[in-house]
């Protein structure tokens, strides 16, 4: 699933924009660990035009920013990749309720180049695909 499809899924009234309430649902789908304060702060930061709603471009930018922060946090040695063997820890840090086996299966599917690591694009596809 792409960021655009996530946008469409959570745009409940199909007006082409996400309200703060709709965005809150998205953020909590990514991770139940986001506080209301975090969500409002993210929303205000990415609402570039300040109209109180997110359009698809603002939303896509937000998704990438949120996931980049999580990725950098999980990329302990800063080499731009997360070992697939640590995927269970990574996914549970996002609040995902996977078994180690399920996590390993999802990572194997996301590790497109088969190098045993998740780069940012693979990581993003893995997390977005789970929403």
Swiss-Prot record:
GO terms for molecular function: calcium ion binding. PROSITE patterns: EF_HAND_1, EF_HAND_2. The keyword Metal-binding applies. Ca(2+) 2 binds at residues 47, 49, 51, 53, 58. Ca(2+) 3 binds at residues 111, 113, 115, 117, 122. Ca(2+) 1 binds at residues 11, 13, 15, 17, 22. InterPro entries: Centrin_CML-like (IPR050145), EF-hand-dom_pair (IPR011992), EF_Hand_1_Ca_BS (IPR018247), EF_hand_dom (IPR002048). SUPFAM superfamilies: EF-hand (SSF47473). This is Probable calcium-binding protein CML34. It comes from Arabidopsis thaliana (Mouse-ear cress). The gene is CML34.
